[in-house]
UniProtKB/Swiss-Prot annotation:
CDD domains: TOP1Ac, TOPRIM_TopoIA_TopoIII. The record marks W61, W168, R176, R312 as: Interaction with DNA. Residues 686-713 have a biased composition (Basic and acidic residues). SUPFAM superfamilies: Prokaryotic type I DNA topoisomerase. The keyword Protein biosynthesis does not apply. This is DNA topoisomerase 3. Mg(2+) binds at E9, D105. Releases the supercoiling and torsional tension of DNA, which is introduced during the DNA replication and transcription, by transiently cleaving and rejoining one strand of the DNA duplex. Introduces a single-strand break via transesterification at a target site in duplex DNA. The scissile phosphodiester is attacked by the catalytic tyrosine of the enzyme, resulting in the formation of a DNA-(5'-phosphotyrosyl)-enzyme intermediate and the expulsion of a 3'-OH DNA strand. The free DNA strand then undergoes passage around the unbroken strand, thus removing DNA supercoils. It holds the Pfam family Toprim. HAMAP family: Topoisom_3_prok.
Length: 729
């Protein structure tokens, strides 16, 4: 009897699919049943070959050998996961296998994971596609009942290959050219370089900003009501101090007369459902989680706990076919503190509306929402619980009615000047009930603060107790943090000085810099390359980042190019552009970049040389700020030696509760805090043992410390090997 091989992206998903398909016979890297063989990748098992596989001369980095432009790029098996590749290959080549089912993540990168394996094996068997947004048993069963022909995703695969090959041609050539020309470990890319340029531009704005003092007037009545002055245009601020002084002097000892009471009933609707970027922004603002950390937590909630849908989505809407599943999802997530809210929604039929249901705004995947799967909070970590809470509350809020309130604006005259006061009466809490009325709109910046207004009629006279001048200073633009940088990458036109409407529309339609699936990795790479650094929550550009922008070709710094390329990749995915045409353009562009770098007469200056010498080659070490602390890195890119000097941990200072920094090596390591607190590692171990009731041994503490320095990386990404060899520092 013939069988079908199912290729999943990860072992955990493979196990779930195998259980549903009753594949319980364990083999070497696969699970088998009567009809199906389920095997798995580990992220990417296959990637584009290194330059040296085309010509041995590319083993050495020489400027004169550039650009490297092989006619066709070859595929190679990633060394670390070669064993699993062979396991998958042996199943694909079985004579009793007549069909392949691609069950990797439903998206461009997932398509690439499976198709590259199939291409490398040189297989010519029919392909079908499983395309699902959650990995619950129901979703898997429904997906297998509605398998799509593999040919329907050929263009998506072509687009994924085009993106990867473009990054190979441009990324590897530009990086080698910069590094060899300027004798420094420099790397650039079509997304990361414009991102660094935006950070630099924001720092320039801050540096050039000159604060101005502005003035206003506030009147206080005997009833402790605060009235705010407004000019004829409704402005409550003026840069003319003399004008404000004159008004204050003129109005002294005058009372206020109520000339108008404006009552308006208003509604505000819940913010939309989460896509990945919006969730990463909120998690950073509320909990300080990095974009990468949030994505990793979401992956666990999706794959391991199966309580949330596919995370790498760029849609904030659900499609109409999902509406019928909402009651089951509400029952599943409506436990514990969410029970009363879910119960309330289920009392009436759910009325879908365009604020959260829109087929035209859902492409590959709908918004992140709860699944119909059972929720076991005791299995969640604290971080998983917090991310789950964000998603469920937003899901419930969208299904609740609007927040309704009556806004009262009191307009008074003091002399011939206008003063106003505002108040709000809540008529119906609506969706804010889910947030216990604590949800605040970040965009509210009105000078006129809402207050509790006494009962007042038009024509009433209010005795003014005090009239005084107020003042403040204009603020410089805020530095980027991870939340605001994600916003900037999603909509870079807001941070660009461009009059080109077509360019702005292109960037908007292509989703900005990077994709929801890649932005977290891009930000992480910028930290690890020491092009940017964190100071507190703020992101600063480093000297290395500044110099890189001065050395790279101008076009690479602008989001324009990325926007145009993303548009073309989208056209390939839709079958409107041939991959070969795009790659030909990329090769020509690579030639231009390399030529420009070669002819540059600029120099790179290391301004972070330490007094330490490299233990491997004896050259000076560079002191850099990594994402998690200070590091020493060898100046020689060929050597690549690096070591940690200090790192920020999750251990908290017993005095001020801030995160402690771990400095030094071995038994001499010491915890240090900005408040001045110091503690030896051995003392910390003893204290932790006591705090845990003498249950923690030295091994537990070492495990805890190891966890602080652990980065949860994807199992493999397509350029892991290549990038490692490039020694991006």
């Amino acid at each position: 009897m013939s069988k079908s091989v199912v290729i999943a992206e990860k072992p955990s998903v493979a196990r779930d699919i195998a259980r549903v398909l009753k594949c319980d016979k364990k083999g070497n890297g696969y699970l088998e049943g009567s009809k199906y063989i389920v095997t798995w990748a580990l992220g990417h098992l296959v990637t584009l070959a290194d330059p040296e596989s085309y010509d041995v001369k590319y083993k050495k980095w020489n400027l004169e050998d550039l650009p490297m432009l092989p006619e066709r790029l070859k595929l190679t098996v990633i060394k670390q996961t070669g064993k699993q590749f062979n396991a998958v290959k042996s199943q694909l080549l079985r004579k009793d296998v007549n069909e392949i089912i691609v069950a990797t993540d439903a998206g461009r990168e997932g398509e690439l994971v499976a198709r590259w394996i199939i291409d490398k094996v040189k297989l010519n068997k029919p392909i079908k596609r499983l395309w699902i947004s959650s990995v619950t048993d129901k979703a898997i069963k429904d997906g297998f009942a509605n398998l799509k022909p593999g040919k329907a995703y050929d263009n998506l695969y072509a687009s994924a290959v085009a993106r990867s090959e473009a990054d190979w041609y441009i990324g590897l050539n530009a990086t080698r050219a910069l590094t060899t020309r300027f004798n420094a470990q420099l790397n650039c890319g079509r997304v990361q370089t414009p991102t660094v340029a935006m950070i630099a531009s924001r720092e320039d704005e801050i540096k050039n900003f000159k604060a101005q003092t502005y003035y206003g007037i506030e009147a206080q009545t005997m009833e402790k009501l605060k009235l705010t002055w407004q000019d004829a245009n409704g402005n409550s601020r003026s840069f003319n101090k003399e004008k404000i002084d004159g008004i204050v002097k003129r109005l002294d000892k005058q009372n206020a007369t109520v000339v108008e009471i404006d009552k308006k009933q208003k509604k505000s609707f819940s913010p939309g459902l989460y896509d990945l970027t919006e969730l990463q922004r909120d998690a950073n603002k509320k909990f300080g989680y990095s974009a990468k950390e949030t994505l990793n937590i979401m992956q666990k909630l999706y794959e391991q706990h199966k309580v949330l849908t596919y995370p790498r989505t760029d849609s904030r809407y659900i499609s109409s076919d999902i509406v019928g599943t909402l009651p089951e999802r509400l029952k599943a997530c409506g436990v514990g503190e969410y029970r009363p809210f879910a119960h309330k929604v289920l009392q009436k039929p759910i009325k879908p509306n365009k604020s959260f249901v829109d087929d035209s705004k859902v492409s590959d995947h709908h918004a992140i929402i709860p699944t119909e799967g059972y929720v076991n909070f005791s299995a969640f970590t604290d971080k998983e619980r917090k991310i789950y809470d964000l998603v469920v509350k937003r899901f419930l809020a969208v299904l609740f009615p609007a927040f309704e309130y009556e806004q009262l604006t009191l307009r008074t005259k003091v002399g011939n000047e206008t003063f106003i006061a505002r108040g709000k009466t809540i008529l119906h809490a609506g969706w804010k009930e889910v947030y216990e009325n604590r949800f605040e709109d970040d965009d509210v910046t009105d000078d006129v603060k809402e207050q509790l207004l006494p009962h007042i009629e038009k024509g009433d006279t209010l005795a003014v107790k005090l009239i005084m001048q107020t003042s403040g200073q204009t603020k410089a633009p805020a530095r980027f943090n991870e939340a605001t940088l994600l916003s900037a990458m999603e909509n870079p036109t807001k941070y660009m000085d461009t009059q080109n409407k077509q360019l702005a529309d292109t960037l908007k339609s292509t989703g900005g810099l990077g994709t929801v699936a890649t932005r977290a990795d891009i930000i992480d790479k910028l930290f690890n390359s020491f092009l940017i650094e964190k100071r507190g929550k703020d992101i600063h550009i480093t000297s290395k980042g500044r110099q890189l922008l001065d050395l790279v070709p101008e076009e690479l710094k602008s989001p324009t190019l990325t926007g145009e390329w993303e548009q073309k990749l989208e056209a390939i995915a839709k079958g409107k552009l041939k991959k070969e045409v795009f790659i030909s353009e990329m090769k020509n562009y690579t030639k231009e970049i390399v030529s420009e770098i070669k002819s540059s007469d600029k120099k790179y200056k290391h301004d972070n040389i330490s007094t330490k010498s490299c233990p491997d080659c004896g050259k000076p070490m560079l002191e850099v700020n990594g994402k998690k602390g200070k590091m020493l890195v060898c100046q020689d890119r060929e050597c690549g030696h690096r070591k940690n000097v200090s790192r920020t941990t999750n251990a908290r200072c017993p005095q001020c509760k801030k995160k402690l920094e771990l400095r030094g090596e071995g038994a001499g390591q010491i915890f240090a805090c900005k408040c001045g607190y110091r503690e030896k590692l051995s003392t910390f171990q003893e204290r932790r043992k006591k705090e845990s009731g003498n249950k923690a041994d030295k091994r537990d503490v070492q495990k805890y410390m190891k966890q602080q320095n652990k980065e949860e990386e994807p199992l493999n990404n397509p350029f892991a090997e290549a990038l490692k060899k490039l020694k991006f520092d």
